[in-house]
């Protein structure tokens, strides 16, 4: 199963900005690795939450469309809420 998500670069950093994103149904994430700088992004929470239910989400290469540019990544780390079925943050590593 091929996964493809639309993402936007986020400029606001910090705890307050991340909480506002989560309250609006989005999830903060970061893309790093390769020869490029790390990029902070924001994704739709519901799309990612549904996709992460599949086992292949963790092993396959995922395509992120960041401002019109496709980036191939793999999930490096994922933080979940302690008792709610919500994602808190995701780290992606360029494939």
Swiss-Prot record:
One Gene Ontology MF term: structural constituent of ribosome
Name of the protein in question: Large ribosomal subunit protein bL25
GO biological process per UniProt: translation
Function description: This is one of the proteins that binds to the 5S RNA in the ribosome where it forms part of the central protuberance.
KW Isomerase (keyword) present: no
SUPFAM superfamilies referenced in this protein's UniProt entry, alphabetically: Ribosomal protein L25-like
Similarity comment: family membership: Belongs to the bacterial ribosomal protein bL25 family.
One CC-aspect GO term: cytosolic large ribosomal subunit
Keywords annotated in UniProt: Ribonucleoprotein, Ribosomal protein, RNA-binding, rRNA-binding
Subunit structure: Part of the 50S ribosomal subunit; part of the 5S rRNA/L5/L18/L25 subcomplex. Contacts the 5S rRNA. Binds to the 5S rRNA independently of L5 and L18.
Taxonomic source organism: Mannheimia succiniciproducens (strain KCTC 0769BP / MBEL55E)
């Amino acid at each position: 199963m091929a996964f493809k998500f639309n993402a936007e670069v986020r400029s606001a950093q910090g705890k307050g900005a991340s909480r506002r994103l989560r309250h609006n149904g989005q999830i903060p994430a970061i893309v790093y690795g390769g020869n490029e700088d790390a990029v902070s992004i924001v994704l739709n929470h519901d799309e990612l939450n549904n996709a992460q239910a599949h086992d292949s989400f963790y092993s396959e290469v995922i395509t992120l469309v960041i401002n019109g540019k496709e980036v191939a990544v793999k999930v490096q780390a994922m933080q979940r809420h302690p008792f709610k079925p919500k994602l808190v943050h995701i780290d992606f590593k360029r494939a």
